Amino acid sequence: MARIAGVNIPDHKHAVISLTYVYGIGRTKAKQICSAAGVAESTKIGDLSEEQVDTIRNEVAKFTVEGDLRREVSMNIKRLMDLGCYRGLRHRRNLPVRGQRSKTNARTRKGPRKPIKR
């Protein structure tokens, strides 16, 4: 197994699919990385030479991925909460942030129903 950005990448899958195992890399970025590294998208990771894997590593290093990206996203949410803006309040109360209705639905974000105590 090749190790890219601290993640074990499966050898038996195509390069584009394998790169999506890294947090922050989807199909589009994986295709960009493969073309920049000069690797065919349908090539399996196990068939690549060590030099090709190194070029892929260097291309991935140009993006914000894994721990840095997770930290950045959590800091953005924390900043919204500290500002006290509407989106921050919605995050703080564990309610939908992007304008969805919350009177009847939003069970995923709110969690299981709480019984009414009489």
From Swiss-Prot:
The protein, known as: Small ribosomal subunit protein uS13
Role played: Located at the top of the head of the 30S subunit, it contacts several helices of the 16S rRNA. In the 70S ribosome it contacts the 23S rRNA (bridge B1a) and protein L5 of the 50S subunit (bridge B1b), connecting the 2 subunits; these bridges are implicated in subunit movement. Contacts the tRNAs in the A and P-sites.
Keyword vocabulary terms for this entry: Ribonucleoprotein, Ribosomal protein, RNA-binding, rRNA-binding, tRNA-binding
GO molecular function: rRNA binding; structural constituent of ribosome; tRNA binding
Source organism: Saccharophagus degradans (strain 2-40 / ATCC 43961 / DSM 17024)
Higher taxonomy: Bacteria, Pseudomonadati, Pseudomonadota, Gammaproteobacteria, Cellvibrionales
Description of how the protein assembles with itself and partners: Part of the 30S ribosomal subunit. Forms a loose heterodimer with protein S19. Forms two bridges to the 50S subunit in the 70S ribosome.
SUPFAM superfamilies reported for this sequence: S13-like H2TH domain
Region (Disordered), start-end ranges: 93-118
GO CC aspect terms: cytosol; small ribosomal subunit
PROSITE patterns recorded: RIBOSOMAL_S13_1, RIBOSOMAL_S13_2
NCBIfam families, per database record: uS13_bact
Classification via Pfam families: Ribosomal_S13 (PF00416)
Annotated family: Belongs to the universal ribosomal protein uS13 family.
A Gene Ontology biological process term: translation
InterPro entries per the UniProt record, alphabetical: Rbsml_uS13_C, Ribosomal_uS13, Ribosomal_uS13-like_H2TH, Ribosomal_uS13_bac-type, Ribosomal_uS13_CS
